[in-house]
Design a protein with these regions (language model features):
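Inter-heme linker and motif-flanking segments adjacent to c-type heme-binding CXXCH motifs
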Residues: 127-132, 187, 204-214, 247-255, ...
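Sequence context of c-type cytochrome heme-c attachment sites
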Residues: 49-59, 83-93, 98-113, 120-123, ...
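N-terminal export/targeting leaders of redox proteins
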Residues: 1-98, 207, 214, 219-230, ...
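Electrostatic cytochrome c docking/interface patches
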Residues: 85-112, 218-264, 362-369
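Small disulfide-bonded, cysteine-rich extracellular recognition modules and tandem repeats
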Residues: 121-124, 157, 182, 226, ...
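Short sequence/structural segments immediately N-terminal
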Residues: 59-69, 89-94, 101, 113-117, ...
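The canonical Cys-X-X-Cys-His
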Residues: 104, 113-125, 198, 202, ...
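Extracytoplasmic electron-transfer domains, predominantly the class I c-type cytochrome c fold
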Residues: 135-205, 279-355
Length: 369
């Protein structure tokens, strides 16, 4: 509303100014026509000018009135501009966000609709999680086989990653996975603005968070202190408990570590267990895209359980130190807006079980370090 009002006022001022200049030009041209040929009698530069009474009287007053009129215009228009400019700016930002979201949706769409088929792998335009075909090669035998790779849901990706971290993933992809590099800088087809519009679209499909007093934008229902909606968190815990009750996992912490909800979007095993993403898991927590969590490495990095919980909650930041000898890369997502502190504690307790298993193996002579 403010933006349209200020635009209307600007148009009115412009039209008045143009009309004034047009009137001045027309009057000047018309008055000059009467002087054609008069220079034969008396040159224009020899005509007597206004006398002092006129110059210091009516003409001076007319100029002063014009000056006062312009002063009134400036006095009114400048404060009006200051009042309306924030609204105009907000309207412009909303317009850009709306257009970028629309353009991003066109890129996210299936190939048949002219997009780059992000929706094809990630579970439709709402990106609720899907499956991507991928070929892997056994490094020992050279055998090539086709697998179905779990492509995670993206409707909570802004819960866990910043815009810059998502941009990095889009630009360079995820090595050794179906996620290709899409940005020009990483060898892909998308310009920097294309990537920006994709991120704007992903913002628009985020699940609205609980505890959001002020969302980040009209098309971005997330916020700094937001949390996964209670109904979604309840569904996560129900699935974890079901896995425990069925005997698939021994504890809720183990079930959360290996959670398959939304194609593993909330799973630790996706990055820390090789083969988990295509249902051929190797050593649990043994390392893949993420570091090895077994062999006591997690305890050496985080001697205090509270420090590990804090790290998992906040994720890593590029260049920022963590733990005892860690420096962040930005690849470790923040799970603090997905899981509660109690749920994170259950996951950490499960990770610490790797250390207990190591001690038991050493005690029984299973292997030697």
């Amino acid at each position: 509303m403010f933006a349209s009002t200020s635009t209307s006022i600007a148009w009115v001022i412009l039209l008045i100014s143009l009309a004034g200049w047009a009137f001045y030009a027309f009057s000047n041209i018309r008055s000059s026509r009467g002087e054609i040929g008069s220079e034969q009698k008396l040159a224009a530069n020899r005509k007597p000018y206004y006398d002092d009474e006129i110059l210091e009287g009516p003409r001076l007053e007319r100029v002063q009135i014009l000056g006062l009129l312009f002063l009134v215009i400036i006095t009114i228009s400048l404060p009006l501009y200051w009042v309306l400019e924030p609204g105009r700016t907000a309207g412009a930002e909303f317009g850009f966000e709306k257009r970028f979201t629309k353009w991003g949706a066109e890129l996210f769409a299936p190939t048949a609709e002219g997009g780059f088929n992000c929706s094809g792998c990630h579970g439709g335009m709402k990106a609720t999680g899907g499956v991507a075909s991928y070929a892997i090669t056994d490094p020992k035998t050279g055998e090539v086989k086709s697998v179905s790779w779990k492509a995670p849901a993206l409707n909570t990706v802004l819960y866990r990653y910043t815009d810059d971290e998502i941009r990095f993933i889009l630009n360079y992809g995820r090595p050794f996975s179906p996620m290709s590099a899409w940005g020009i800088i990483g060898g892909g087809p998308l310009t920097d603005q294309n990537v920006t519009t994709l991120i704007e679209y992903m913002k628009s499909i985020q699940i609205p968070q609980d505890n959001c007093v002020e969302p980040r934008g009209p098309y971005n229902p997330t916020c700094v202190d937001g949390k996964l909606p209670a109904v979604e968190n309840k569904a996560i815990m129900a699935e974890a408990q079901r896995q425990v009750d069925s005997g698939t996992y021994a504890t809720v912490g183990e079930a959360l570590f290996n959670l398959n909800v939304n194609s593993g979007a909330y799973s630790c095993a996706r990055c820390h267990t090789k083969g988990w993403s295509y249902d051929d898991p190797q050593a649990t927590g043994g390392g893949a895209f993420g570091p090895n969590l077994t062999g006591g490495s997690s305890v050496r990095q985080f001697p205090n359980q509270s420090d590990m919980i804090s790290f998992i909650s906040g994720g890593s930041e590029l260049g920022k130190r963590y733990g005892e000898q860690g420096q962040g890369s930005g690849r470790m997502p923040a799970f603090g807006q997905v899981y509660t502190d109690e749920q994170l504690k259950l996951i950490v307790e499960y990770i610490l079980c790797f250390v207990v298993q190591l001690v038991v193996l050493k005690a029984h002579g299973g292997f030697h370090l």
